């Protein structure tokens, strides 16, 4: 197994070349890729629930491609890079896990602490703010119930 860094760099290079040399890849936008993003996320769910390790590995790769594709589009537009995406999520995980990366103790209500930190970071006053509008009705309802239970 090679280091993740090597293969992620390779994927970034492949994506950069595709955006230059492949007409289909070059034409894509964040909006045109939304259907693919949702489809790949659903295929990951299917692989977790019913697939093999090989299926899950493949579907996670397809989902990772979507992340890199969107980041490459943003980079081509001068907005942000895949490094910005990775730095942002790593920083967020560290901030939200002081019991791991700081001197905080493990709280009994880890989920509640996570949600409170998230609200503070986003400047939200209600636990119901920030629920994705594009979620299905069922998923949105589940999210509302989950957040309500956390309070």
Describe each region flagged by the PLM.
Residues 1-59, 65-151:
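Flexible "arm" and connector segments at domain edges
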């Amino acid at each position: 197994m090679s280091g993740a860094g090597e293969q992620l760099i390779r994927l970034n290079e492949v994506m950069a070349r595709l955006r230059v040399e492949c007409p289909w890849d070059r034409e894509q936008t964040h909006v045109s890729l939304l259907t693919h993003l949702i489809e790949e996320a659903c295929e990951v769910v299917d692989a977790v629930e019913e697939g093999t390790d090989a299926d899950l590995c493949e579907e996670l790769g397809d989902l990772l491609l979507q992340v890199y594709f969107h980041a490459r589009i943003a980079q081509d537009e001068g907005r942000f890079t895949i490094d910005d995406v990775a730095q942002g999520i790593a920083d967020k995980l560290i901030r939200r896990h002081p019991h791991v990366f700081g001197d905080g103790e493990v709280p009994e209500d880890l989920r509640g602490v996570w949600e409170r930190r998230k609200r503070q970071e986003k400047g939200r006053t209600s636990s119901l703010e920030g629920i994705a509008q594009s979620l299905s009705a069922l998923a949105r309802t589940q999210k509302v119930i989950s957040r309500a239970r956390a309070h």
